[in-house]
């Protein structure tokens, strides 16, 4: 099989097992220079924290949000379910409407 066939001439009936990458001149990556990391860190400044500290901060933030959401959920259940089931009495009985309306009054 000839591998130098241009892509536009390959038909649907031909099976391609390998397409060479003609732009890749060298498969070996060059070793990074020792000063690249220092230059990138100096250019970026110290404002960007390392990935370990950033991920720990995200975990703490998610924990706080989960705690607040759980607290709000329990408060809503307490307010709308537990407090609403209890009878509520008033100190001023004269201003409250009667519980049972009598049509013969």
UniProtKB/Swiss-Prot annotation:
Stored InterPro entries: AcMNPV_AC78
One matching Pfam family: Orf78
The protein's name in its UniProt record: Uncharacterized 11.7 kDa protein
